[in-house]
Structures are given as C-alpha cells and as structure tokens.
UniProtKB/Swiss-Prot annotation:
Protein name according to UniProt: Large ribosomal subunit protein uL13
Gene3D superfamilies, per the entry: Ribosomal protein L13
Keywords: Ribonucleoprotein, Ribosomal protein
Similarity section: Belongs to the universal ribosomal protein uL13 family.
Length: 142
C-alpha cells in the first residue's frame, strides 16, 4: 500500500458557517484554523491546501474569559521611531468587530504562501447576514 498524497486540483472544498454568538474567541479560532488547514479530512497533506471555506457570522458577539476584554492588548507599529500603538480586545471589538478573530486564526496558520492562501478562505462578518448563500454553507456547531 502506498502513502496517499493529495493533489491541489483533486481537493473538494465544502463551505461551512459558524455562528460566533457568545462563543469564546480562542475556541472558535482553533477550530476555524483546524478546518482551514484541512486537518479534519483523511486526505490531509501538509504541503497542499486541503481546507474548507469557513464563514463566521456574529463575530461582534465573540467573548473572552476573565479580564481579557480589558487586559488583552493588540500591538501594531507604524515603522517610525516611537510609532507603536496598542489597543485592547474590547476597543478592537467596538471599532473592528471580527478583526480579533482574524488575527487569532492567522497566528494559528502556517507562515508563507500556503498559509496566506488558507487565510483567504476565511470570511468574517460582524452581523448575522453574509453574501455567500449561493454556496449553500452547512452549519457547523462548536
């Protein structure tokens, strides 16, 4: 018996929708990263993008446990001396709902061309509506 290796043109991708209302950020992010990578499939191959498309709705209603809403910090830098900016999870959810989830998932995926292709299959929406009903996504419960 030979070892199976998936080919990029033979991969079939499903569409899934996740309702993130009152779900914990890290638990949703780890499941999304797992499925974007394709590790839930028997034909998973590390060097081929075998993952599915994931739609996350109600990302503005994600929560974190403990005091992380005020204590968890996100940093960015302008590139200039002294140009570091920080924001908390709570403020980021107010200004850009869903960005915290995108950053969490992106950190869990491989770095490089394969990881960049995987993150493009993630669609995050702050509200309950999404424009992907034509793909007939299946509900995924976490």
């Amino acid at each position: 018996m030979k070892t199976f290796s998936a080919k990029a043109h033979e991969v079939t991708r499903e569409w899934y929708v996740i309702d993130a209302t009152d779900k914990v950020l890290g638990r949703v992010a780890s499941e999304v990263a797992h499925r974007l990578r394709g590790k839930h499939k028997p034909e998973f191959t590390p060097h081929v993008d075998t993952g599915d498309f994931i739609i996350v709705i109600n990302a503005g209603k994600l929560r974190v446990t403990g005091n992380k809403a005020t204590d968890k910090k996100y940093y960015r830098h302008s590139g200039y001396p002294g140009g570091i900016y920080e924001t908390t999870f709570g403020k980021m959810q107010e200004r850009f709902p869903g960005r915290a989830l995108e950053k969490a998932v992106k950190g869990m995926l491989p770095k490089g061309p394969l990881g960049y292709a995987m993150i493009k299959k993630l669609k995050v929406y702050a509200e309950a509506t999404h424009p992907h009903s034509a793909q007939q996504p299946k509900a995924l419960e976490i």
